[in-house]
């Protein structure tokens, strides 16, 4: 497993496989999945965190079932662009996953993804209790959608036939 940039992963991803989006929290891992054309991110049920080995296996089971080619994981930078303790925890999680999978990871700036996800859920008139259940996967979808949009832009600028 390696950590790649969005430009690097655009070069190596095989067609017809999905990408998973992850929002790593202390209690849950928010999940989302792309369609096979890599245009749309869809939220999936969260993984309730127990301990790393169990969390990792649940994530790998999800990846296998969904034929995932790689992961986009939110990097929770501070608003000033500095890396805080949550960034360190995210990087440690990815380093630990290195022992478990050969699938690549992309770090994606997730600043304000949870805020944006919550606003959408509020606009949809989702109750506070339901928002709490859905917020992490909705944030994972925002993270993944940002990466998918960038991949689409890279494909268009490269003249890729899959960008239409």
From Swiss-Prot:
GO biological process assignments: rRNA 5'-end processing
GO cellular component terms given for this protein: cytosol
Disulfide-linked positions: none
A GO molecular-function descriptor: nuclease activity
The entry's keywords: Cytoplasm, Hydrolase, Nuclease, Ribosome biogenesis
Compartments where located: Cytoplasm
Database matches in HAMAP family: Nuclease_YqgF (MF_00651)
Job of this protein: Could be a nuclease involved in processing of the 5'-end of pre-16S rRNA.
Protein name per the record: Putative pre-16S rRNA nuclease
UniProt organism field: Rhizobium etli (strain ATCC 51251 / DSM 11541 / JCM 21823 / NBRC 15573 / CFN 42)
Phylogenetic placement of the source organism: Bacteria, Pseudomonadati, Pseudomonadota, Alphaproteobacteria, Hyphomicrobiales
